[in-house]
Amino acid sequence: MKKWNDVYQMVKNGDLDASLLKTGCENLKAARERATHVMEGFKESFGATEDTMVALCSAPGRTEICGNHTDHQHGRVLAAAVNLDFLACVALNGTSVVHFQSEGWPMTSVDLADLEVKEEEKETTASLIRGVLSKLHKAGYPVAGFDMYVTSTVLPGSGLSSSAACEVLIGTTGNHLFCQDKFDAVEIAKIGQAAENEYFGKPCGLMDQTASSVGDAVAIDFKDPSNPIVRSINADLTGLGLALCIIDCGADHAALTNEYASIPEEMSKVAAHFGKKVLREVKEEDLLADLAQVRKEAGDRAVLRALHFYADDRRAAEEADALERKDKEAFLNLVKESGRSSWELLQNITPAAAITHQDMAVALAVAEKALNGKGACRVHGGGFAGTIQAFVPVEDVCEFKKTMETMLSEGCCHVLSIRPAGGLIL
């Protein structure tokens, strides 16, 4: 923590450029201006002085590259942090209340005197704040009120996991303010996941939080979720001649919690037939050997979703290896296979019984046309709505973006890069 004016001058003078580069910024001048804007917003919102002790912190959104809905079954995933983030200025306020001012939104206030789950707070930012800080408190660290001014380029419903980025932001900040930075990135991810499951009320695996908290590209094996194996991958997409595009399909996934919840529920129902809790504990050959009975007990969709798990779990490991050895053809083929499996087996492209509106299916069909046999595309993240992902030859990216935005909507196609750092105190 340093005085507001000292940090402000450090940003303006370029003394924090090395930290800003870790956020994946492509324009240092713009990054400095954004950081000073956040500091000015903090000062104006909370009446801070130039001597107020502050810190700048950042947490990125994430992109899932392979392993669609495998994490909650203790499977393997390939994911990466991206250069869209939450950037915040924070200061202790001497009270028990957290004041969270997200730019352009009403203030969120959370009194830490009560750290119990609040039903009325579920699916709100307040629940994430209370949940993360409750976990730090239960770990034996005294938590206290702080003021935080936040700007975000990770929009809710964007498929880049804004909730996980918010959890990592609060976790990284709390770890710095109250825990002397004793928690590592994976531990912060676990805290965020617990907050989302228990306080926010949304079942989720650990992929989103781990990718955001650790940074760069990561291959994660959740066989032991209390101790996931995290392997950093040098995902040099530019070296492969590829650009990462995230396309907003035009439908909001914020109200689809039941659709998302049905996937882990049905996969776990298949596992339960074999006396297990998750599919990672069940051999695929055992499922195939008893397929008729499992279909009767769990239903056909559950069986198809289980078959997707086994295939995408293998693909996640193969795709990480392909990226590491810079095998472009193998990588793109695996992306295509993953996309087909999500559509045909996992069935998370269109909400159940949706006929008139199938936004994600249309977006995928348009992307296939725009790619014209080159590159690859797939559903991105939870599915049903939100975004799709495309890996596009760099020489075609401008034309691809133009085609997608002409056929879908202006501004729907975002060209991103992989961010080197995860949750970060600048």
What are these regions (language model features)?
Residues 99-101, 145-152, 182-194, 332-337, ...:
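Beta-strand segments within the central parallel beta-sheet cores of soluble alpha/beta enzyme folds
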Residues 75-94, 214:
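Structural signature of FAD isoalloxazine-binding scaffolds in flavoprotein oxidoreductases
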Residues 133-156:
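Glycine- and acidic-rich phosphate- and metal-coordinating loops
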Residues 1-62, 87, 91-122, 219-378, ...:
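C-terminal nucleotide
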Residues 81-83, 160-180, 389:
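DPxDG-like acidic metal-binding loop motif
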Residues 138-146, 174-188, 394-407:
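Phosphate-handling active-site elements
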